[in-house]
Each structure stands twice: as structure tokens, then as C-alpha cells.
Swiss-Prot record:
Similarity section: Belongs to the methyltransferase superfamily. RlmKL family.
GO cellular component: cytoplasm
Subcellular location: Cytoplasm
Species: Aeromonas hydrophila subsp. hydrophila (strain ATCC 7966 / DSM 30187 / BCRC 13018 / CCUG 14551 / JCM 1027 / KCTC 2358 / NCIMB 9240 / NCTC 8049)
Enzyme Commission number: 2.1.1.173, 2.1.1.264
Protein name: Ribosomal RNA large subunit methyltransferase K/L
Length: 717
């Protein structure tokens, strides 16, 4: 008997072991991501031809202890390679694993290649050439636990490739994982539907199973084609047997398979795939969104003369691998999809079995179904759950509202604030700000977009519970506001005392224009933790605009310059905008251009504001400064703490503040205490105006900011 090894994705080992046993393999033994087995050559061939779960079938040539590269070379050199291939064949060596002597896989592969070539050369044979892309013979070696294992690949291209794909949608499901999903679902040939079928992999795989078609039947090339020990006669007999079984199976196959997808382009590829696989007549494809999902099986006709509906409606299996998103920002739309799928299942698929694969337990929870069984599978490196459900015959679409307390509060806020915002002619405002402690997030509306920013939860609350509450909030917010899930942006932030540092989330550019009391402003809802507009200072900016006519205006820690825009529109004679970030300074210039505020009278300075303040000597009639609570940026020479350093800040600002001028000072430190005595000592006076600058949508947060008007003492005398 020969010794073989079958590789597979993690989670498929048991399925593969049972499959190989049914094919006649002996001494079957599971290991991580693979199965050891023994048998005659025919068993190896059958595994290559019939395995629906394996990735590769390899013939074990040698296993030996290995401490260093010499052991590897000598172990490979002793294998009678000339019995497996000739010098005219091309070879490739794939190597995995490392140890202190073999520190990279390329070196390990090179040592084995050298051993092979040297053996051929020393015996007077032509030495084989290397072809890494498409070799006649592929040698595979693995180093682990002090042992080297050298094998000969019998598969050729990976066995999950069925050679019918004409094109795929994004992130296509591998065929052996699709086969595993079908096996674990318990499907027994009843009607099957995939409501998000993509390129049709699950449905084509189901058709192969129903028609008794060997998964490798369409393959033209195997790894053993140029192997010297290949038994062509034996292989042809096994191949003919599989062809006969497929022909007979296809003739008697009456399986009903249905596939839906919202993307018409992907459906075209799915149809092409089914046609290329020879199973197009078994699959009905339809363009449909999951929110409008309907049962594909007809209702039975009522029996004439009898009450009721006659015979029961046929039931089936719904199986799918819906998108599950790898980035948090993708979740809102996916929540909507999963919630819609769960509603559709309860509404129209009573009595059906359901099997869903996902890497996100939170998304699966949005189905609002109780799983009967659960399996752990891997989609590549991504750990997933396959959950099986049984839809009750009397099931109805759920009327229960998700996160009901939160939904009620949001509905109340929306009713009040929507009317106020329309009256004020505002298209961006805060809808919710952690009003309920257990739903710890801020929700801002920007026209027809929602930005949901989760505050970091206390460490004693389990992460899974926090995550589930966040997703419940998003679901409820979508339902209450009627927003499209695609237009809900989800972010996670620490609860900050102020604008510590502006954090970038991605390299993309998503800008949109909003309006605020006549000012046109660019915001970016996606790429940064903050959007470019601090909504809590809306009234402050309006006030600055009203105060600015004929004034020389200075904006420090200017961010995106929205306050400068208001001052410019209010008639400021000149403006100076200072910020350390070139990105935000460019953004400020774009905001000014958007409002036709261009010219030499509008200056933009990239500088450390504290350093710039200590050196500047111009005079300004109106100054706005909104510094961070704390900053220790690499580009700043020293750290800054607004409580500790605000008096020093005022000393510099006093020098720049013209006689009769006004300084508007704000910060976000909770419980900030102004040093009034210190101010008086340097000749300044302050008035707290926070009550006037906190807008209606922030009334619930008394500590969102504090704001002061500061003037020269003699001006208030």
C-alpha cells in the first residue's frame, strides 16, 4: 500500500476523512487541515477524481528527522527521484515550515532542488529544469516538529478548482468549502435556494452532488500526468466509470435549484458558470434583492369542494454565504441585509431548513433565529460559523423592535430636532448623544447620512455584549430614521476630553457639501474619525460671523477653517487661519473657496500654534481659539494641557488682541476652571458664555464644551 495525505481547509477534516473512507481508503487519520490515509494507487486516483472536500492529494515519498540543512539535503538525496520522473521533466519545489537552520522557505526549497539535481547529475542523467508556474512534477515538502516530510503532488492545480468558472463576483466561495456547507446543512436533494448566490458556486456544487458528477471530471490536467509510475490504463478505467455515472445521474436528476442576487452582472457570470459546468438546466437564476425575497416554490392549488388549502406546500433548503464585511464601517448595510433575510424567512419560508455561513456572530444574531446546530469552518484564514436553522410552520415576520428603549428615545429626539433643524435651515445635527447609558454612542445626521460613533465601553463590560448593543443601535437607527443602510457610517472612538488628535481612518476621499447658516462647508464622513465639522460649535461660529464685520480675524487651532468661513461671510476685513496640519489647512482653503472667499486678505499658516503665538506680533480685532484638551504631537516641541497652560496661552493672546478687541476661547475639558485671578493679573477679563453657544441638539450634554469671551480689562471697566 502507498501512503497519501489529503490537505483541506480547517474545519473540513472530518468530512474529508469520512469521504476517503467511503472511497476505500485505509488507516484514515485526521490532523489539522488534512487527513493521512493509505491504499493502493487506485485509491489515490479516486481521491483526486471524487473528493469534494480536499485541496490536494499528495503521495508521501519520505519522512525523516531533520536538524539542519545537511539533514534536509541528504534526506532528499536518498529518494529515488529517477523512478518518479525523467530529466526531461520540469519540476517545482514548494516548501513550508522553518527551524533555526532553515530560516526561510525559499532556502528549504533550494536545498531539496539541489539534492534532486545532484542525484540526476551523479547518475549521468539529464538534470531536470525548474518551472515554478506550470511544472510537470510538483514536489511538496513540510518541516515541523523536527521532521521533514517530502511528497509528490498528484493533484496539479488545487482540487477546489472545478474548471467551470467563467468569472466571479467579489470574494468567491471556494468549491470545497461550498461542498462542506452543503454536507453540513443536511441537504438531501430537496429544492434548494441561495438568495445571495453571487457566482453560483453553492448551486453548481449542489447540482454536481445531485447528478453524481465527480468534481474533477472536467479537469484536463493532473499532477500525475508525467509521473513515471502513473498507471494510465487504471486511470482511464476510473475516469470512464465516473463519466458513465455522471451521464446516468444527469439523466435522472430532477433537483430544483434557485439562485438570486441583486447584482445583474454577477448573475450573468453565475449563468455562464452553470452553463460551463453542464448544469444550467437544473438552476433557475433571478435578479432579486434579499429585502424582496420570495419563496420560489408554488403554492398548492386548493382542492375543489373542500375547505382549506389542500395539500401542504413543498418545503426546501435555503443555504447561503452572505457578505459579512471585514471592516466595521461595512456593518450597517449588512445589518439591514441580515435583518431583511430573517424577516423574509419567517414570512415566506415556513417549514424550510436554513443554513448560513458567516464570520460574524453579530450579523447572524440579526436573523433573530435560533440555531439547531453550529459548525466551525474556515473561509481561507477567516474563522466562520455555519449555523443550521429550522423555520417553524407557523412562523411570522417578527414585529418586535430591536433595542426598544433606544428606538423610543431616538424617535422622540428625531421628532423634536427634525422640526428645529428645518426651521434653522440646518442639514447636519446631533440626534443622540449617549442619552441612555447602555447605548453608549453619538449619532449625527448629515443630510441623508447617519454617522454613528461608539464611545469606548468600560473595561468590565464584555466586548461581545458591547458589540451587540452597537449593532442593535444601528439596526434601530436605520428603522427609526428610514435611512438607507448604505448611508450609515459606523465608527468607534474613545470618549475624549477634547479634540486630542485628528485621526485618519483610510486613504480614500469621500467629501460632501453641507450648509450651516448660509455657509457652505465640506465634510468627510468616512475617512477620518471626525468629519471636519464640530457640530457643538455651530452657535459659536454663527456668533463669530455676526461679530466679524470690518474686523481682523485670527483662527488658531483652526482645523478645517469653518469658523474662518463664517467670519469671512460676516464681513471680516482680513482673516488668518493657523493649524499644524497641512491636510486640514488645505481643507480650510477649500472651504473658503467654496464660499468665494479668496484673495490676499485671507492667509493660511501651517505652524505649531503655540510656537507661532510666541513669535507673532500682528494685531487682531477678533480671535477664536479652540485648543485641544491635551496634545503631545511629534511636531510640537512640548506637550500642552489646557488646564495647566491656559494662562500662558492668554499672555500671548493678550499681546495680539487689539485694543477693544474680543477673544473667544473654547475648550472641551470637562470641569475646566478658568484662572480668573490670573487673568486679572495680566489685564484680561472673562465672561462665560457656554449657555449661549451650546446648541439645541447638544442641550443634553452640559459638558460638550465651555466657551468664554475675553477682553482687555480696561475695555470692561
Amino acid at each position: 500500500m502507498k501512503e497519501f495525505f489529503a490537505t483541506c481547509p480547517k474545519g473540513l477534516e472530518n468530512l474529508l476523512a469520512v469521504e476517503l473512507t467511503n472511497l476505500g481508503a485505509e488507516q484514515v487519520r485526521e490532523t489539522v487541515a488534512g487527513v493521512h490515509f493509505k491504499g493502493e494507487l487506485a485509491i489515490g486516483y479516486k481521491a483526486c477524481l471524487w473528493s469534494r472536500f480536499a485541496s490536494r492529494i499528495v503521495l508521501v515519498l519520505s519522512e525523516f528527522q531533520m536538524n539542519d540543512d545537511l539533514d534536509l539535503y541528504l534526506g532528499a538525496h536518498t529518494i529515488p527521484w529517477e523512478e518518479h520522473f525523467s530529466g526531461t521533466s520540469t519540476i517545482a519545489v514548494d516548501f513550508t515550515g522553518t527551524n533555526p537552520a532553515i530560516r526561510n522557505t525559499q532556502y528549504g526549497a533550494l536545498k531539496i532542488k539541489d539534492a534532486i539535481v545532484d542525484r540526476f547529475t551523479k547518475r549521468g542523467h539529464v538534470r531536470p529544469d525548474v518551472d515554478k508556474k506550470s511544472p510537470d512534477i510538483r514536489i511538496m515538502a513540510h518541516l515541523g516538529k523536527g521532521k521533514a516530510n517530502i511528497t509528490l503532488d498528484l493533484s496539479g492545480p488545487a482540487l477546489h478548482q472545478r474548471f467551470y468558472r467563467q468569472g466571479t463576483g467579489e470574494a468567491p466561495l471556494k468549491e470545497n468549502l461550498a461542498a462542506a456547507m452543503i454536507a453540513r446543512s443536511g441537504w438531501a436533494g430537496e429544492p434548494m435556494m441561495d438568495p445571495m448566490c453571487g457566482s453560483g458556486t453553492l448551486l453548481v456544487e449542489a447540482a454536481f452532488i445531485a447528478a453524481d458528477m465527480a468534481p474533477a471530471l472536467r479537469r484536463e490536467r493532473f499532477g500525475f500526468d508525467r509521473w513515471l509510475q502513473h498507471d494510465s490504463e487504471l486511470w482511464q478505467s476510473l475516469l470512464m466509470e465516473a463519466q458513465v455515472r455522471a451521464k446516468r445521474g444527469m439523466q435522472r436528476c430532477e433537483v430544483k435549484l434557485f439562485g438570486c442576487d441583486a447584482d445583474s452582472r454577477v448573475l450573468l457570470k453565475a449563468r455562464d458558470n452553470a452553463k460551463a459546468a453542464g448544469v444550467a438546466h437544473l438552476i433557475t437564476f433571478k435578479q432579486a434583492d434579499v429585502t424582496a425575497l420570495e419563496n420560489p416554490l408554488p403554492m398548492p392549488a386548493p382542492v375543489e369542494g373542500e375547505e382549506g388549502q389542500g395539500e401542504a406546500r413543498q418545503v426546501g433548503m435555503l443555504i447561503s454565504n452572505p457578505p459579512y464585511g471585514e471592516r466595521l464601517g461595512e456593518f450597517p448595510a449588512l445589518l439591514e441585509v441580515h435583518q431583511a433575510l430573517g424577516d423574509a424567512l419567517r414570512r415566506s419560508f415556513q417549514g424550510w431548513k436554513v443554513s448560513i455561513l458567516s464570520a460574524s456572530p453579530e450579523l447572524l444574531s440579526c436573523l433573530r433565529l435560533r440555531a439547531d446546530k453550529q459548525y466551525r469552518l474556515f473561509n481561507g484564514a477567516l474563522e466562520c460559523q455555519l449555523r443550521n436553522y429550522q423555520i417553524a410552520q407557523d412562523s411570522v415576520a417578527s414585529q418586535k423592535e430591536v433595542a426598544q428603549d433606544f428606538a423610543n428615545r431616538l424617535r422622540k429626539n428625531l421628532k423634536t430636532l427634525e422640526k428645529w433643524a428645518q426651521k434653522e435651515n440646518l442639514d447636519c445635527y446631533r440626534l443622540y448623544d449617549a442619552d441612555l447609558p447602555e447605548y453608549n454612542a453619538a449619532i449625527d445626521r448629515y443630510q441623508d447620512y447617519l454617522v454613528v460613533q461608539e464611545y469606548a465601553a468600560p473595561k468590565d463590560i464584555p466586548a461581545q455584549k458591547t458589540r451587540q448593543r452597537l449593532l442593535d443601535m444601528v439596526q434601530a437607527a436605520i428603522k427609526v430614521t428610514g435611512m438607507d443602510g448604505e448611508k450609515v457610517i459606523l465608527k468607534v472612538r474613545e470618549r475624549q476630553e477634547g479634540k486630542q488628535q485628528y485621526q485618519k481612518l483610510s486613504e480614500e476621499q469621500h467629501r460632501m457639501e453641507v450648509q450651516e447658516y448660509g455657509a457652505r462647508l465640506w465634510v468627510n464622513l468616512y475617512d477620518y474619525l471626525d468629519t471636519g465639522l464640530f457640530l457643538d460649535h455651530r452657535q459659536t461660529r454663527r456668533m463669530l460671523g455676526q461679530m466679524a464685520k470690518g474686523k481682523r480675524f485670527l483662527n488658531l487651532f483652526a482645523y478645517t477653517g469653518s469658523a474662518t468661513v463664517h467670519a469671512g461671510l460676516g464681513g471680516a476685513s482680513e482673516t488668518t487661519t493657523v493649524d499644524m496640519s497641512r491636510t486640514y489647512l488645505n481643507w480650510a482653503q477649500d472651504n473658503m473657496r467654496l464660499n468665494s472667499l479668496v484673495g490676499r486678505e485671507h492667509k493660511f499658516v501651517q505652524a505649531d500654534c503655540l510656537k507661532w503665538l510666541s513669535e507673532a506680533d500682528d494685531q487682531y480685532d477678533l480671535i477664536f481659539i479652540d485648543p485641544p484638551t491635551f496634545s503631545n504631537s511629534k511636531r510640537m516641541d512640548e506637550s500642552f494641557d489646557v488646564q495647566r497652560d491656559h494662562l500662558l496661552l492668554m499672555q500671548h493672546l493678550k499681546r495680539l488682541l487689539a485694543a477693544g478687541g474680543t477673544l473667544v476661547f473654547s475648550n472641551n475639558k470637562r470641569h475646566f476652571k478658568m484662572d480668573l485671578a490670573g487673568l486679572e493679573a495680566i489685564g484680561l477679563k472673562a465672561q462665560n458664555i457656554t449657555g449661549k453657544t451650546r446648541p439645541k441638539d447638544f442641550e443634553r450634554n452640559q459638558h460638550i464644551h465651555n466657551c468664554w469671551i475675553i477682553t482687555h480689562a480696561e475695555a470692561q471697566a
